[in-house]
């Protein structure tokens, strides 16, 4: 086991298993099919991550909306300016669209159907929405967005992770191109 230093708020480690024998009685499923089993579980993971990203986007949007309403410059709230309003409003719209896709993925998953397309889209849209909301929040707070006091800098770092993990946006786009749109495999 080896710890991996990250910019996250939780521990990440590598675990290595070398020359481990698993008794037949302890096998999960059929030998040699493990990767397929893992793939089947990834839809649930993508739904879970999309849910977390939606929560992050809501947090960022609430923080930036509140700050924009309270912070005054030249005797008026900064949120009265469209240049401040629009990025926050757009991030909210992206979050709501991702949330609707997430509900569709959850519905299919709960019915026992394959939500591959919807789970992938929900994860991608939610990760993008969280990142857009994070950027709008930092921009709205200006220099205070980098201060540890507001927690924005920490959440900003965490929101970045879901652009690349547990599956990158590019892999999701490859999945959509191949499995949904019927295009040739790109890798």
Question: What is each PLM-predicted segment?
Answer:
Residues 52, 83-86, 93, 117, ...:
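Alpha-helical coiled-coil segments
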Residues 39-40, 141-187:
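Glycine-rich phosphate/cofactor-binding loops in nucleotide/flavin-utilizing enzymes
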Residues 1-66, 76, 171, 178-179, ...:
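FAD-binding core of flavoproteins
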Residues 65-79, 92-125, 138-146:
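C-terminal helix-coil-helix/basic helical segment that borders enzyme active sites and/or dimer interfaces
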Residues 25-45, 67-81, 105, 139, ...:
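Conserved catalytic-core motifs characterized by acidic clusters
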Residues 129-137:
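Hydrophobic alpha-helical segments of membrane proteins
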């Amino acid at each position: 086991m080896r710890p991996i230093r990250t910019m996250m708020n939780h521990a990440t480690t590598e675990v290595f298993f070398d020359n481990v024998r698993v008794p037949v009685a302890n096998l999960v499923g059929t030998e040699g099919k493990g990767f397929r089993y893992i793939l089947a579980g990834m839809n649930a993971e993508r739904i879970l991550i999309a849910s977390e990203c939606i929560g992050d986007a809501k947090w960022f949007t609430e923080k930036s909306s509140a700050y924009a309403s309270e912070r005054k410059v030249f005797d008026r709230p900064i949120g009265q300016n469209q240049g401040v309003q629009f990025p926050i409003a757009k991030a909210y719209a992206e979050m709501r669209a991702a949330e609707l896709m997430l509900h569709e993925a959850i519905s299919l998953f709960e019915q026992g159907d394959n939500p591959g397309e919807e789970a992938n889209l929900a994860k991608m849209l939610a990760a993008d929405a969280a990142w857009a909301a994070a950027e709008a929040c930092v921009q709205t707070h200006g220099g205070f967005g980098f201060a540890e006091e507001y927690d924005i800098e920490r959440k900003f770092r965490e929101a970045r992770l879901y652009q690349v993990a547990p599956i990158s946006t590019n892999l999701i786009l490859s999945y959509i191109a191949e499995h949904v749109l019927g295009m040739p495999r790109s890798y």
